[in-house]
Swiss-Prot record:
Keyword flag Magnesium: no
Family: Belongs to the CPSF4/YTH1 family.
Pfam family membership, one: zf-CCHC
Subcellular location field: Nucleus
Alphabetical GO biological process terms: mRNA processing
Lineage: superkingdom: Eukaryota
Chain positions of all zinc fingers (C3H1-type): 45-74, 93-120, 121-147, 148-175, 149-174, 177-199
Zn finger (CCHC-type) location: 301-318
GO CC terms in record: nucleus
Keywords, sorted A to Z: Metal-binding, mRNA processing, Nucleus, Repeat, RNA-binding, Zinc, Zinc-finger
Protein's name in the database: mRNA 3'-end-processing protein YTH1
Primary location class: nucleus
């Protein structure tokens, strides 16, 4: 059995009973972990979970019981610089697209996922439909940034007082006064996050709100058609294009294509129309018998909702059949 080491001090009143009254396994390091990290080269901890000061020569000033991060030996795969972005625009957009399975805590790829697991809306591109129409059909599921407030900061409030008060059309952001700046000099300068009130009157340009971005200037894919779904080289955004619903496995699926169908690009629509024409010609030439393309045998398809063969889960006719709907038991 692997030994465990915990450097947390014992409670003088509880002693060893503290492990049972208030168990804390945050700083427990097993010998098996060191073996997997050093010998098998496994990455057991994320970079955000390890205390960066604990691996320095000076060490962390906080004891392990008070530090919110883990004091453990990192693996060789930890603290590696991120790989450079690919040169192809489609592959680059794929690396910048947030993994939809990661948002639902269902991604099993981990660091090997081809999509990013760093979800920060302010680093995402601006949603062109929200800028142009003032709303987005995806709402909270949209992975692009919705700039709801494009007002500038009130320069008078930053100086110390605004006569308009809450009726001011500009933003009032409360900041604490920088003690070093009030004393005469702040070494951080413009990078300081505290307030640096200026005695001079602000210029007239500081009261003007920024110009909203032009939707025509965006060359990236819209929210319903991100990179990784469809062909980037053959895709051109057209706001007047007709959206055609398609199956989830057809080229050009949207963010919700895995559950409610996707969207076909122009090439996919052209190919589908050509297939329909060929099917019609084949049906007329063979006495009315229709010759379609390859079709999956439904007798081999198992519905994960009702556990019966013969249909897909999105076309399940047994809506009221009890059982393991969606594999909930397996996830437990």
């Amino acid at each position: 059995m692997a030994a465990a080491s915990n450097s947390a001090p014992l409670d003088p009143k509880l002693g060893r009973a503290a492990d049972f009254v208030r168990p804390d396994f945050h700083q427990v390091n097993l010998d098996l972990e060191n073996y997997l990290k050093t010998e098998r080269n496994f990455k057991l901890d994320a970079d955000q979970q390890i205390c960066p000061l604990s691996i320095t020569p000076l060490g962390c000033p906080l004891p392990p019981s008070q530090c919110p991060y883990r004091h453990t030996t990192p693996s060789q795969l930890n603290f590696k610089p991120p790989p450079p972005l690919p040169a192809h625009p489609r592959e680059r957009e794929k690396k910048l697209t947030v993994c939809k399975h990661y948002l639902r805590n269902l991604c099993k790829m981990g660091d090997n996922c081809e999509y990013t697991h760093d979800f920060n809306l302010r680093t995402m591109p601006v949603c062109i439909w929200f800028v142009k129409q003032g709303k987005c059909e995806l709402g909270g599921e949209c992975l692009y940034f919705h700039p709801r407030d494009r007002r500038v900061e009130c320069p008078d409030y930053n100086r110390g007082f605004c006569v308009l008060g809450p009726n001011c059309p500009r933003k009032h952001i409360r900041r604490r006064l920088c003690d070093a700046y009030a004393a005469g000099f702040c070494p951080d300068g413009k990078d300081c996050k505290l307030a640096h009130p200026s005695p001079n009157r602000p210029p007239a340009e500081s009261y003007i709100n920024p110009i909203p971005p032009d939707p025509e200037a965006f060359n990236g894919p819209p929210p319903q058609l991100p990179a990784g779904y469809g062909r980037w080289r053959e895709y051109k955004y057209d706001p007047n294009a007709v959206v055609v619903p398609a199956a989830a496995w057809v080229e050009g699926g949207s963010l919700s294509g895995w559950r409610a169908g996707g969207f076909l690009s122009a090439n996919a629509r052209r190919d589908n129309q050509r297939n329909r024409d060929n099917d019609d010609e084949g049906g007329r030439g063979s006495g009315g018998e229709r010759k379609g393309g390859w079709q999956k045998d439904l007798s081999t398809v198992l519905c994960f909702r009702c556990n019966q063969y013969g249909h897909f889960a999105n076309n399940c006719p047994n809506q009221y059949v009890p059982g393991d709907r969606g594999g909930g038991r397996r996830r437990e």
